[in-house]
């Protein structure tokens, strides 16, 4: 009997650590991320939009390019596919705050939508929140998969998947950097 795989959804995750050859100074990245938050440099000014809580980088630091290279290297090692950065933004969730359920698609133009979403846990309190990814499988609709967060942890998944961050139970804010990528074809 032959088998044809029609769909396969993968979520790639790892921790970028010095033992893996990555020495990313996330304090510098955090400083730039917080700057956009403090100056209220929002990606979208409409309060009814889920992008209202997304903040721009005011002046991206060199560490962000190191992070981007690490993400590309990790993805290539896992998939043998090359990706290029499309967009990047910051999300900061205070005590008892959670995010909206969203995906990274451009609903008015699927052709312009990114292929992959990458979440980087820049400065988080371990186990204070979870990344929750929603997906459909053959037998269930809106199935949830929960992932623990920790500093320097990286998640890469298709941009069609909806995701959100659960409530932050820590007294400290959790800082996430979201990247979107296209395939280099």
Where are the predicted features?
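A short hydrophobic beta-strand segment most commonly corresponding to one strand
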Residues: 117-119, 154, 171-185
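Hydrophobic beta-strand residues in large extracellular and virion-surface proteins
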Residues: 29, 71, 75, 90, ...
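Non-heme Fe(II)/2-oxoglutarate
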Residues: 1-82
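Exposed regions on extracellular, virion, or secretory-pathway luminal proteins
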Residues: 80-81, 147, 168, 172-173
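Aromatic-acidic/polar surface patches that form glycan- and anion
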Residues: 60, 64, 111, 148, ...
């Amino acid at each position: 009997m032959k088998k044809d795989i029609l769909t396969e959804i993968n979520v790639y995750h790892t921790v970028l650590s010095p033992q893996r050859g990555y020495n990313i100074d996330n304090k510098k990245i955090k400083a730039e991320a917080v700057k956009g938050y403090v100056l209220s440099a929002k990606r979208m000014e409409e309060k009814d939009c889920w992008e209202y809580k997304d903040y721009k980088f005011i002046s991206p630091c060199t560490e962000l390019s190191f992070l981007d290279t690490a993400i590309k290297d990790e993805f290539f090692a896992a998939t043998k596919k090359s990706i290029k950065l499309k967009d990047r933004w910051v999300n900061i969730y205070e005590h008892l705050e959670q995010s909206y359920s969203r995906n990274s698609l451009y609903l008015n133009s699927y052709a312009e939508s990114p292929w992959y979403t990458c979440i980087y846990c820049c400065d988080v309190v371990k186990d204070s929140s979870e990344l929750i990814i929603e997906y459909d499988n053959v037998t269930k609709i809106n199935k949830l998969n929960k992932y623990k967060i920790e500093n320097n942890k990286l998640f890469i998944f298709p941009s069609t998947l909806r995701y959100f961050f659960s409530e932050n139970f820590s007294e400290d804010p959790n800082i996430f950097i979201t990247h979107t990528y296209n395939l280099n074809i």
